[in-house]
Swiss-Prot record:
This is Transmembrane protein 35B. The keyword Signal applies. One of its GO terms (cellular component) is membrane. It is a multi-pass membrane protein.
Length: 150
């Protein structure tokens, strides 16, 4: 199972590194303009807006791009602790993405990719959690005698 978990981790890491790079570096003019327009919408419904903070759309896009790029790279080549931290950060990011798309009342087909990524990241996190706790929970070596009734 650890091989499959490793493959999932690498695939997710490469995916997020590429999507982060696409947000940071101008791929093509139409794609960059479309992404800028999307982040203008995303900034309008930013979850912290209720507390008076609304990010600049370009800064928002840049921050998300760097987070995806760095967390994706750390998922692939980072030490285990940084892989787990990166996974948690990406889970939070994908939760925010799903929230944003739901608030914008986008069609289901728009937020399915973010929901699938969120599910895969949660699966990866669960596998890491189970691997950590597997050694911590051990069966007792002595048999426990059955309780006798009074």
């Amino acid at each position: 199972m650890s091989f499959r978990v490793g493959v999932l981790r690498v695939l997710l890491g490469v995916f997020f590194a590429l999507t982060g790079a696409a947000k940071l570096f101008q791929v093509s003019a139409p794609v960059s303009q479309q992404m800028r327009a999307l982040f203008e919408q995303f900034a309008e419904v930013f979850p912290l807006k209720v507390f008076g903070y609304q990010p600049d759309p370009i800064s928002y896009q840049t921050a998300v791009g760097w987070l995806e790029l760095l967390a994706g790279l750390l998922l692939v080549v980072g030490p285990p602790v940084l892989q787990e931290i990166s996974n948690v950060l990406l889970i939070l990011l994908m939760m925010g993405a799903v929230f944003t798309l739901v608030v914008l009342k986008e069609p289901l087909s728009t937020y399915v990719p973010a929901a699938v990524c969120l599910g895969l990241l949660l699966l990866l996190d669960s596998c890491h959690f189970l691997a950590r706790t597997k050694g911590a929970v051990r069966c007792p070596s002595k048999k426990i005698p059955p309780a006798h009734g009074n």
